[in-house]
């Protein structure tokens, strides 16, 4: 009897083990599904953007921001640093001044914006400017490689041509970005996230390969890689679809003149609104007060006596890791921060930016070695944190800029706001060059570099005092009155959506 009861007891227990096993399988399957969900989320996000904005617009952003700005821009930064240092043998403070000149074509973005908005060529407003941009960049990049060692002024002119090509292509695609951000305002943060992801991904590839290019081809030969991006922009200009204007030739001049007048009046009227000029002023202050010490850092990085003497390949790796961290910054903003007000995000991001600047000071003073942290580990950690915070700090300002653009002159006005950004960066480069020169930082003397960095960090802290200029609103709020432009619009306005011609 007892044996039968025991057998029954154990036989009754056996089914109890099965649900536990099933539960374990369910948990394993859930974890697997979660991993798959995370992996396919970016593709679902791209599909959503393509369906709501159209695939051609997304591809246009990938080409201009990913290849033109990200990849080519990162190659430009690293290779030109070595070019001025090793080929032209220029002092770091002078290179800072040259780098400021690179921003002149970007300062001229309102002019490029006016051309794309009101001066179509052969009935097209976008296609011809892509071609012009690509040809200019292609010729400039090839010239600086083929002509050998050029005088500094001529070499600077070629590099300015490459920079101008990037700026023109950027303006053309930004006009479309501003239009879509206005028409579908809920997607404005997503569009900027797409831009930043493409830019960071392209920069990651560019930085990762830049050191190898410099090592294998030399600083001057590596500049030839800059011809790749404008070549793709030329092809894009020929194969992109755009609806041709139906305006007859006899009416063209009058239409262009009227359009120019409307654009200028709209800009003047818009910029007078406090909701517009206050955040624009903050954007300039936050960039201008953040004086650049990049060339001082770069010369110190690669100096075998005073600095850690990083190799060309490792310098590229540092920047590549920074680009990867930028992508994490975009992800953090997109997932966690885009619902907060512009003012709150910028306030806390600026405070973290001050802290990241103090890490530079620790590295220059070599306190990291006292703490037992190797130079390579510390610089990669510092670069990652700085780039991530920089991106979180920058995206809200760009999103805010798109919300300040009145419909009808969005290309021109967005270019105007980005021109303010370029002025700020130019002031940052020249201000940093002046301070480096004033404190006697040269190719081989870095004794006062830590003082320059300390001054820069203090100025970053001062910037926090101006955050009140930023509106305490989010990306869904109306910032610009709807009556900025006259209501009369041309009936045959071109469709600004970029559509790739499917072959």
Swiss-Prot record:
<keyword id="KW-0812">Transmembrane</keyword>
<feature type="transmembrane region" description="Helical">
    <location>
        <begin position="56"/>
        <end position="76"/>
    </location>
</feature>
<dbReference type="InterPro" id="IPR039309">
    <property type="entry name" value="BT1"/>
</dbReference>
<feature type="transmembrane region" description="Helical">
    <location>
        <begin position="344"/>
        <end position="364"/>
    </location>
</feature>
<feature type="transmembrane region" description="Helical">
    <location>
        <begin position="221"/>
        <end position="241"/>
    </location>
</feature>
<feature type="transmembrane region" description="Helical">
    <location>
        <begin position="194"/>
        <end position="214"/>
    </location>
</feature>
<dbReference type="GO" id="GO:0016020">
    <property type="term" value="C:membrane"/>
</dbReference>
<feature type="transmembrane region" description="Helical">
    <location>
        <begin position="450"/>
        <end position="470"/>
    </location>
</feature>
<feature type="transmembrane region" description="Helical">
    <location>
        <begin position="369"/>
        <end position="389"/>
    </location>
</feature>
<feature type="transmembrane region" description="Helical">
    <location>
        <begin position="281"/>
        <end position="301"/>
    </location>
</feature>
<feature type="transmembrane region" description="Helical">
    <location>
        <begin position="128"/>
        <end position="148"/>
    </location>
</feature>
<feature type="transmembrane region" description="Helical">
    <location>
        <begin position="153"/>
        <end position="173"/>
    </location>
</feature>
<keyword id="KW-0472">Membrane</keyword>
<dbReference type="InterPro" id="IPR036259">
    <property type="entry name" value="MFS_trans_sf"/>
</dbReference>
<feature type="transmembrane region" description="Helical">
    <location>
        <begin position="404"/>
        <end position="424"/>
    </location>
</feature>
<feature type="transmembrane region" description="Helical">
    <location>
        <begin position="101"/>
        <end position="121"/>
    </location>
</feature>
<keyword id="KW-1133">Transmembrane helix</keyword>
<dbReference type="Pfam" id="PF03092">
    <property type="entry name" value="BT1"/>
</dbReference>
<comment type="similarity">
    <text>Belongs to the major facilitator superfamily. Folate-biopterin transporter (TC 2.A.71) family.</text>
</comment>
<dbReference type="InterPro" id="IPR004324">
    <property type="entry name" value="FBT"/>
</dbReference>
<feature type="transmembrane region" description="Helical">
    <location>
        <begin position="314"/>
        <end position="334"/>
    </location>
</feature>
<keyword id="KW-0813">Transport</keyword>
<comment type="function">
    <text>Could mediate folate transport.</text>
</comment>
<protein>
    <recommendedName>
        <fullName>Probable folate-biopterin transporter 6</fullName>
    </recommendedName>
</protein>
């Amino acid at each position: 009897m007892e044996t039968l009861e025991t057998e029954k007891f154990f036989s009754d227990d056996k089914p109890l083990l099965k649900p536990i096993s099933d539960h374990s399988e369910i948990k394993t399957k859930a974890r697997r599904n979660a991993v798959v969900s995370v992996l396919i989320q970016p593709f679902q996000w791209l599909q959503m953007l393509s369906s709501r904005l159209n695939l051609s617009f997304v591809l246009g952003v990938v080409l201009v921001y990913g290849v033109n700005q990200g990849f080519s821009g990162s190659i430009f930064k690293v290779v030109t640093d070595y070019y001025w240092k090793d080929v032209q043998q220029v002092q770091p403070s002078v290179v800072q001044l040259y780098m400021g000149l690179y921003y002149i074509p970007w300062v001229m973005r309102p002019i490029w914006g006016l051309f794309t908005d009101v001066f179509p060529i052969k009935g097209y407003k976008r296609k011809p400017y892509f071609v012009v941009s690509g040809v200019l960049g292609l010729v400039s990049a090839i010239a600086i490689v083929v002509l050998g060692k050029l005088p500094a002024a001529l070499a600077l002119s070629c590099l300015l041509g490459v920079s101008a090509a990037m700026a023109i292509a950027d303006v053309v695609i930004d006009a479309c970005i501003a239009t879509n951000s206005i028409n579908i305002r809920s997607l404005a943060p997503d569009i900027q996230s797409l831009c930043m992801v493409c830019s960071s991904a392209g920069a990651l590839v560019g930085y990762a390969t830049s050191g190898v290019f410099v090592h294998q081809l030399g600083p001057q030969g590596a500049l030839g890689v800059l011809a790749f991006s404008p070549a793709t922009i030329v092809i894009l200009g020929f194969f992109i679809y755009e609806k041709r204007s139906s305006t007859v030739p006899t009416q063209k001049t009058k239409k262009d003149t009227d359009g120019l007048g409307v654009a200028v009046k709209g800009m003047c009227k818009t910029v007078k609104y406090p909701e517009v000029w206050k955040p624009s002023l903050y954007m300039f202050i936050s960039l201008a007060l953040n004086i650049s010490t990049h060339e001082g850092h770069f010369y110190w990085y690669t100096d075998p006596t005073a600095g850690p003497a990083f190799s060309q390949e490792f310098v590229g790796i540092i920047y590549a890791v920074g680009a990867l961290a930028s992508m994490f910054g975009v992800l953090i903003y997109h997932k966690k921060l885009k619902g907060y007000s512009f003012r709150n995000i910028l306030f806390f991001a600026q405070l973290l930016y001050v802290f990241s600047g103090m890490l530079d000071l620790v590295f220059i003073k070599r306190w990291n070695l006292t703490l037992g942290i190797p130079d390579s580990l510390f610089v990669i950690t510092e670069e990652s944190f700085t780039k991530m915070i920089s991106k979180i700090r920058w995206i809200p300002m760009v999103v805010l800029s798109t919300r300040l653009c009145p419909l009808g002159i969005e290309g021109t006005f967005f270019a105007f706001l980005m021109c303010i950004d370029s002025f700020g960066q130019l002031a940052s480069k020249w201000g940093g060059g002046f301070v480096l020169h004033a404190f006697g930082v040269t190719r081989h003397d870095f004794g006062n570099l830590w003082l320059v960095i300390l001054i820069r960090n203090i100025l970053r802290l001062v910037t926090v005092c101006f955050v009140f200029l930023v509106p305490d609103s989010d990306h869904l709020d109306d910032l610009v009155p709807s009556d900025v432009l006259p209501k009369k619009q041309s009936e045959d306005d071109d469709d600004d959506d970029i559509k790739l011609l499917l072959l």
